[in-house]
């Protein structure tokens, strides 16, 4: 496998820490050891997160090509767009963000706090759009790029989650290689890796990266899109493409993609009671905050699987904390009593 042939622009601090979740593990019976790899602490650029790791492989093209404006898209409380705005500010580039109405959640402050607030503070041109949720290529995003061109700019396209970009899976191939180095220091290997999946490239990169040592199907994606078949197909497609890019040496098949569909409801961006319980439990046991859109759902999945005995006794499970905590501010009414 050859990831090193791709240029990488450093936007992160370096290897993200792996934290043992001792109190949460004990609370859930102590038969399974839980750990978290803290991608939520990976950068000083506006709280970072998993997209910052991905952007390290996209940004060289933007800089070398003389692009002057990063153009991206997401929901109103998109972590992706906040991280793109941060990278643009860091590099002295312009930034246009399309923020679509992906979540059926009504709160007077929803479009004024959290991620979108930070993007505005960092100087991004934030454009609200009424279109609903979808993980594919969006007309509003293409229109934003046309607008930049008409003004004489040169837009660099960054799709939702970086996932439709040809290099969108590379960052989390690097994640897997980083985990292997840390496992050598820890003296053991993780039996399972749990990760939230929506647009697909995070899990796709992990599948390829862990396929190198036979653990592709030990990456357990927790769907948070509530459109799991579309997400599953996108993970597989991105993983197959990424495997070719890095010369994995074997094909990625449907068997390699594990996507648990039990925890994504009621729909994208809306937490269920299990999501909220998981957010509170993790916060009160470990002071590790998760959000109602993504990490609260993957945390719910991992907790539920431990409680149900779905991980064999003695398993070591690595939870990939992808970030997203700024979105908590947009759901303050739900947590008004804690």
Curated annotation (Swiss-Prot):
Homotrimer. The modification N6-(pyridoxal phosphate)lysine is found at residue 51. Its EC number is 3.5.99.7. Gene3D superfamilies: 3.40.50.1100. This is 1-aminocyclopropane-1-carboxylate deaminase. GO terms for molecular function: 1-aminocyclopropane-1-carboxylate deaminase activity; D-cysteine desulfhydrase activity; pyridoxal phosphate binding. It holds the Pfam family PALP. Signal peptide: none annotated. It comes from Ralstonia pickettii (strain 12J). Its cofactor is pyridoxal 5'-phosphate. The keyword NAD does not apply. Keywords: Hydrolase, Pyridoxal phosphate. The keyword Phosphoprotein does not apply.
């Amino acid at each position: 496998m050859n990831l090193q042939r791709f240029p990488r622009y450093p936007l992160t601090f370096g290897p993200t820490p792996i934290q043992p979740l001792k109190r949460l593990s004990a609370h859930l019976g102590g038969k399974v050891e839980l750990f978290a790899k803290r991608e939520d602490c990976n950068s000083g650029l506006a709280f970072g997160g998993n997209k910052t790791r991905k952007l390290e492989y996209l940004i060289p093209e933007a800089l070398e090509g003389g692009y002057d404006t990063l153009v991206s898209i997401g929901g109103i409380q998109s972590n992706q767009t906040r991280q793109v705005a941060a990278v643009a500010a860091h590099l002295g580039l312009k930034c246009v963000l399309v923020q679509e109405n992906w979540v059926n959640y009504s709160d007077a402050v929803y479009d004024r706090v959290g991620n979108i607030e930070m993007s505005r503070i960092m100087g991004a041109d934030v454009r609200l759009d009424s279109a609903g949720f979808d993980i594919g290529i969006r007309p509003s995003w293409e229109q934003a790029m046309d607008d930049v061109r008409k003004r004489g700019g040169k837009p660099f396209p960054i799709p939702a989650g970086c996932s439709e970009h040809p290099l969108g899976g590379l960052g989390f191939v690097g994640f897997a290689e980083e985990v292997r180095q840390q496992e050598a220091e820890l003296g053991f290997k993780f039996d399972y890796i749990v990760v939230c999946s929506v647009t697909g490239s995070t899990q796709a990169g992990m599948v390829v990266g862990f396929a190198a040592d036979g653990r592709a199907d030990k990456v357990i994606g927790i769907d948070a899109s509530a459109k799991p078949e579309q997400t599953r197909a996108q993970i597989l497609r991105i993983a197959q493409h990424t495997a070719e890019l890095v010369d994995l040496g074997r094909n990625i098949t449907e068997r390699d993609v594990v996507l648990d569909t039990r925890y994504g409801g009621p729909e994208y961006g809306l937490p269920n009671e299990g999501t909220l319980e998981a957010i509170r439990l993790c916060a009160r046991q470990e002071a590790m905050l998760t959000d109602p859109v993504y990490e609260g759902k993957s945390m719910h999945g991992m907790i539920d699987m431990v409680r149900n005995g779905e991980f064999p006794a003695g398993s070591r499970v690595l939870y990939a904390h992808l970030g997203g905590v700024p979105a908590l501010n947009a759901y303050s009414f739900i947590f008004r009593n804690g």
